[in-house]
Amino acid sequence: MRNQILPLLLVAASITANAQQKKDSLYTRTIEDVKLHKTGNPNNARVSTIKSQLDVMETPQAIAIVTHEFIEQQQAQQLSDVVKNVNGVYITSARGASQDSFGARGYTFGNENIYKNGSRVNSGIFPEVSGLERVEVLKGSAAILYGNVAPGGIVNMVTKKPLFNFGGNIALNYGSWNNVKPTIDIYGGLTKNSAFRVNGSYENKESFRDIVQSEKHYFNPSFLYNISDRTQIIIEADYLKHHFTPDFGLGGLVLNTTTNESKLNTLLGINKFPGATWQYQTNEMLTSTVTLNHEINSNWNFNTVAFFQDYTRDFHGTERIQWNLQNNGDYVWKRTLNKQLQEQKYGSLQFNLNGQFKTGKLNHKLLVGADADYLQADTYSYQLQKQDGTFADAGNNFVYGTNGNTSNGNILLSDENTWKSGEMLNSRQKDLNRIPTRRVGIYAQDLISITDKFKVLAGLRWSYLENKSTIVENYLNNTKTYKASSGNPKESAFSPRVGLVYQIDDSFSTFASYSNSFNPNSGRDINNLPLPSSLIDQYEIGLKKNLWKNTLAFNITAYQIENSNLAQTAAFDKNGNINGDTNIKEMTGATRSRGIELDVTGNPTPNLSINAGYAYNNMVYTDTPDSEGSFVEGERLVRTPANTANASIFYTLPKYVKGLKLGFTAFYTGERLAGWNNLKDKNGNPKTNRMYEIGDFTTVDFTIGYQFKKFNVQGRLGNIFDVVDYNVHENYSVNPITPRNFYLTFNYKF
């Protein structure tokens, strides 16, 4: 990856050297949404995530937008700080503190649900928020536009774009635990037809957690050129390197290793770190995007987006902290050590044609598009050298106990002296697993205005997914083999979408919609054949209302999502014997997710901005076989809070102390279940409880800032009441939320 960074630096240097301080005197395609940034009302916006010319008010789907103004007001440090402003979106876990995992409407987001400028991007890294223009969240199914995505929604990060008027800002941030972060953003015109932007940051910080520290570099140059009055090209690059201490938190307390019955670990202080003092993880990601926009005429336009991503994850450390209860009442963790290198190369290409036309008395807004992508995912596994000089596979079976003991990995929760780690061990590469995947999609949708008020949206997507055989290269015996994919090698599906919109006027609309998506499954059936995808139906109704002279959005949505063919462990094998292989499955389960979402967003006055929301979700298993290994009907799925809420208010004093801004933010996360959902025994009854409850919590932040001419000073006191709670992945990555903290920003705009 390093040999690809130098060209970025040269491009940025040439751009900056040739920058001209010149106002835009030529018509150009609008980069910033003026209505959105002026009113703060997402209902007034044109959202790039939906790929079409539809306004938010005529789109039969819930949409949320968090602008850069709000990101800056809240002094957000990572993407999770941003999406918490979207009702119904929540953090499901923070596995190893290497990434935030999000969920919505009962479903967990994966790589298929996180996008940058409309292109799928790896979610295994903390994105840099200082380079974001805004974050768009398309709730519910987005299958017709993006293919096999989880039905909870997608998050699209829109990066800052070039501007023709010269300007920028320089900022220095400082916070708790020696958090130092300078940022810079410079933009301007190069010629009357071209413009640039360069922004970047450096962050170095420690943590309230012992041992844990982090260092991050970010660089984002972009270039815009108006080829003609109707044609524009934007070239962007984005480089992020994050070196940090992987942190699996406090670990769970396992009461029974046979049943995995567990409970929350409250025996350790939130600062305690039982891992190796030297462990590390380095994530690097380089992305580049080329976007071509062309207006054919006043009614028709198309755009093409080419995207490339190079991602690397280098991990070496302990993981999966599980304290097992002993007969003497103490807890023991058999500490293990792993080393792994992951490399991903991903490329995508999409084409969208939008047009407006009439057939008789009917008005149409048509979208026709196609996309294709290719992913090569490489995973290198390692062997580590034991104290006796021999090598053994790194992972769950390689123990690493007190002072680096490689024959006895047991450490005691009650005795921190047993946590001591030795030096980093020698290693050698064992093998490479390469998984190639490619996807193709073709889609079309049309919004038909039957009357000025009544509109119908109909669309269809065909998706093709190919999972090629995994290539395995063993470096120890110099062999190369192929093994079948764990999923279906070739699969295709149609995803329909139908919506009805009744728009009373420009400020009030109601809608109802149906959409269908598919979710690929891993595993095999009893005949050793790959499983088909699960098909998921979603129904949604809602209303969108603009208040206060269209400066305030009030939206309500209700939904139901049904998965009627959930893949579960098969009860019996093909010979009729009880099945003990969890990789052998059958399409016999069903889940249902129901919920409501309410939000109020906007700037009712020039000095006041409001963002508030509430969401309720209930996702349960509705149908499972009465056989051993099946899930339990009526049981809520783990990691999905029933209730979430958010409220933020910022007010700038117009007189007396002009320029003084005060802000208040509160986030509520309801009770959740950690661990794993329960399974039935051979009689169809629930086995020992594998889940445990995590209590609800509310964090409150207070912000104060003062702006004088081009200078701005702002401070935030986070988690004022020093609330203690946790994000939990299964039963082993138990990460405490950040305690009371402060964050200061000194900013100069030019």
Where are the model-predicted features located?
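Acidic, small-polar-rich N-terminal luminal/periplasmic segments of exported/outer-membrane proteins
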Residues: T30-N165, I541
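Outer-membrane beta-barrel translocator/receptor signature
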Residues: G131-E133, I144-P221, I227-T231, L286, ...
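Acidic/polar loop-and-plug regions of large Gram-negative outer-membrane beta-barrel proteins
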Residues: E203, S207, S222-N226, R230-E295, ...
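Structural signature of Gram-negative outer-membrane beta-barrels, strongest in the C-terminal barrel
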Residues: N226-S228, Q344, N363-K365, D371-L375, ...
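Face-selective signature of the C-terminal outer-membrane beta-barrel domain
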Residues: S288-Y311, T336-I471
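Membrane-embedded beta-barrel scaffold of Gram-negative outer-membrane proteins
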Residues: N293-N297, N301-F307, R313-G317, S509-T510, ...
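Gram-negative outer-membrane beta-barrel transporters
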Residues: D452, E586-N677, T745-K749
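C-terminal beta-signal and adjacent terminal beta-strands/loops
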Residues: S564, I610, F667-G684, G705-F750
